Amino acid sequence: MKYVQKASSSYSSDTALALSGNNTPDIIYVEDKHVKSWADAGYLAQLDNGDFTGFDFENKNSEVWESGISRYRFDPETATSGEDAPLWALPKDIGPTVLFYNAAYLKELNIEEISVPEDKLADYNTANGTSYLAKGYDSANRVFNNRIAMSWEQVIELAKEMQKVEGCDYGYYNEWWYAYGWSVGGDVVQYMDEGYYKFTLNDTGKNYIVKDDTAAVTINGTTYDAGELISYADRDAVTAADKESLNELPSMYDAFLEFVALTAKEGSVVGKTSTGEDKLGYGVSMGANSLGTADAEDYFVSGKFGMFVDGRWEVPTLRENMSESEKWGEGSWNVAPLPVYKEYDADGNVTVHGAAAGHSGSMGLAIADGSDQKEAAFEFIKYVVGEEGQKAQSLAGFAIPNQIALSKDEEIFLQTAKDPVNSIVFVEAAEYQRPGDWWSLTDSSWIDEWANYLNYTVRENKATVNELFEKYYDSTQEKLNQYTGY
């Protein structure tokens, strides 16, 4: 086999150009965000049409993360994805996002750090004579539990605490809205029965989740179990009787406002809520334009960020620049789950919660449709995505194995003798996270204009969220209509 290395910065564009020519490579890397456009252009060979054997394409044995397989399915005829859509690549890895936090800052602030799953907290309290609540950050007791997701409010509380440490400019950095919108059942785009995609980032309709003490509820012909979010398609069919079994959650629009408020100056107006009130900024994060050409991990390593959201790929860098550094040392950082929408009663018990949510990235391996060595190419791909190839890749700590069993192996992936000790959080995140909005359609042209305005104007305190939608809603919907010829 001949391996040709390409610069990562131009890999996708260089590969797309090569695939459009007559002298194509045999095997290619394909990011999840490009698989739809490359399949639509006829660049890739379909893997599950019977030409290739020896792999569980339908993942019947659930050996591979389902979100790893499903993100490489796409039907060019209908411009949709689904379990019956053709498969164009196999996942080389999966990279969930989590919350990285500065554990040294917690110690400096006299905040106790514990690592106790919620179902073991009662036993922990009994054994230690404590009465800690099931919270990610319990400000009353000054305890941070890295095994329980913080609520939106707790993130703000802890971020403001961290900003009291000299050198910590911002307590929190998160450039993605996904954990906020998806946690309450919202999304930026929805496929409608009429055959078009609808821009729903500003949707003000309330969302619903099945109560934890409810066995199941059927709405509009769909059965939902306890803890499941009601889909956008079924939401309008919820009756007064159904609501007895459901908890109401914020709208996608209000969740988006919460995200944008992170970077807004404290007390400044971010926009109007769905009920007409002013949403005020928190001043705990930095906008993308302010970050400039630097990376979030650079600010984290320097101590300017107390917490930031990113993927497993940051681990080798942080091990080298923090765990092995004189300034920080081992145990100076760790990881925790992404925040989740939660409401509490007066005693600190959760009464309403959203779903754990977030995005993950993945790199796939595909066969060029123009290859004349397809069978040999597939044998190589099977090796890389198989047990032996995944073991070799995972020891570097860069990404999670595509195979579930390997990802839970102490030596191969968890590696709890090294930072981050709480690496099980990555495995748990891989179970529920999905691709970002860049994957939704064949390209990102419907995203680019409003996203640039969001990141470089709205999140820099130069415009409100309402101005964003006034300026870009109609043009974005027009672009979405073009994908299906609506």
Kindly give the residue locations of the regions a language model identified.
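C-terminal capping/gating helix-and-loop segments adjacent to ligand/active sites or protein-protein/ligand interfaces
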Residues: K418-E478
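Mature extracytoplasmic/periplasmic domains
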Residues: L44, R312-S325, L338-K342, G358-H359, ...
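Beta->alpha turn/N-cap motifs
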Residues: V30-H34, N174-W177, T293, D310-V315, ...
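Glycine-centered hinge/linker elements that transmit conformational signals in sensory
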Residues: Q154-A159, E194-T293, L338
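Glycine-rich, aromatic-lined ligand/substrate-binding cores of catalytic
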Residues: F259-A264, G292-E314, A366
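Extracytoplasmic "Venus flytrap"/periplasmic binding protein-like
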Residues: K2-R73, E108-L109, Y299, G306-M307, ...
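Hinge/lid segment of periplasmic solute-binding proteins
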Residues: D32-T97, V116-N128, D212-A216, N334-L338, ...
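Hydrophobic residues within well-ordered alpha-helices
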Residues: T15, V155, M162, Y299-V301
